[in-house]
Amino acid sequence: MTETAVQPQGLLRRAMDSMQLPKSRTKCFFLFLLSVFFTYAGFHHLFVPDFYVSIMPPWVPWHLELVYLSGVFEVMGGVGVLIPRFRAMAGTGLVALLIAVYPANLHMAFNPHLFPDIPLTALYVRLALQFLAFYWAYTV
């Protein structure tokens, strides 16, 4: 009687198949990149909140609490896009999150004197890149 050894690459293949990843390597790459980007950003909000608190418009209440909340949602969305059952919901949630944080980006662009360490061009480019991020999250 021969014993069948479990092949690690077989386990990995089954795990990857269960994730129902896109067939295109390019789409798969961008899905993982989206996940890493938002998961990293979320943990950054949670562990280094001072910068994010500083960019919030003064009219928004509960600065620290909302920074933590956005960090949690970023991590959830970043992980969620990798789980087929939650992928569409996570993408929609990330779009909602991006819309919710857009006022902070506008605040920075309209008040560059408050952020002298960040070049004005970067503040405006960030506004434009946000629309690319909307599309990216929406199309998962």
Task: Locate predicted features.
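Membrane-interface extramembranous regions
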Residues: 2-140
